[in-house]
Curated annotation (Swiss-Prot):
Source species taxonomy: Bacteria, Pseudomonadati, Pseudomonadota, Gammaproteobacteria, Legionellales
Stated name of the protein: tRNA N6-adenosine threonylcarbamoyltransferase
Keywords on record: Acyltransferase, Cytoplasm, Iron, Metal-binding, Transferase, tRNA processing
A single GO BP: tRNA threonylcarbamoyladenosine modification
Note on cofactor: Binds 1 Fe(2+) ion per subunit.
Organism: Legionella pneumophila (strain Corby)
Binding site for substrate: L134, V135, S136, G137, G138, D167, G180, N272
Residue sites binding Fe cation per the record: H111, H115, D300
EC class of the enzyme, as a word: transferase
Amino acid sequence: MLVLGIESSCDETGVAVYDSESGLLSHALHSQIATHRVHGGVVPELASRDHVNYLVPLVDEVLTKAQIRKNQLDGIAYTAGPGLIGALLVGSCFAKSLAYALNIPALAIHHLEAHLLAAKMETPSLDFPFIALLVSGGHCQLIEVNNIGEYRLLGDTLDDAVGEAFDKTAKLMGIPYPGGAVLANLADQCLSTPYQFPRPMTDRPGLDFSFSGLKTHALNTWNQSEKKESDRSEIAKAFQQAVVETLIIKCKRAIKESQSKRLVVAGGVGANKALRSALQKWIKDIKGEVYFPALEYCTDNGAMVAYAGCLRMMRGESDGGLGVMVKPRWPLA
């Protein structure tokens, strides 16, 4: 089965072609960082307009790379939520219209489900059940994954998502948008730090997260410093250490409570070097397994949507009718 995947939930336009027999045939991505940098964050209206401009060229690009024609496609999968409503509507309307023109099924895909399954796309031998740590700019969750569509939420953030906390902390210290990755690089390059930040919500039972207080702690530390480059790097390192250790502590609890020693890390923050290294060390110590998507599939992309769509379409699933129903807020579990 050949499935075209379309991702347009926020500020990246992703398109891919996945084959149930041969795997991922091609994918292409347009990032809108340059468009939004001048505004210091994502502007929803501009994001929607950018998707309109790039969807058709990207579809043509992936079909050419895959050496297939539109009429060879068996289905089209698209992100229907959660995300920015305008951006979601652009991708969903395009997908439904193209599917109608080609007389093939279209299927709405949950953005978070696509992230959860991204590691399985590259490692088909990854079996259910597993625990997933979903860490991105909009989410920070621990999820028990028992099968496709069978999810149980174990823990969620009570305020900021972890990627959001990275970006906001960077901005508070004068690092321009998108500053989260820059903050992480500063932390990686800093050899040591005199600062010790709190590990939020690790002193109580449960698997929920909270990062707003950590962000405030970083701001206060920055304001009390001389605001030199060395201060920025040392605060970045202390902040990242606190985030990583907090995530590790919560993952340990989740694994201990479950019957599986398989951990899947999904979402853009899954590309963080310090987090990857710490998780790999810990999971090795307990003789468990940890799976990460390749770096290019950690952030939003069309490949994960095409893959999730292919799995569901092979089970006979598809949208009913031409109606477009996107869900800006859409709980996974």
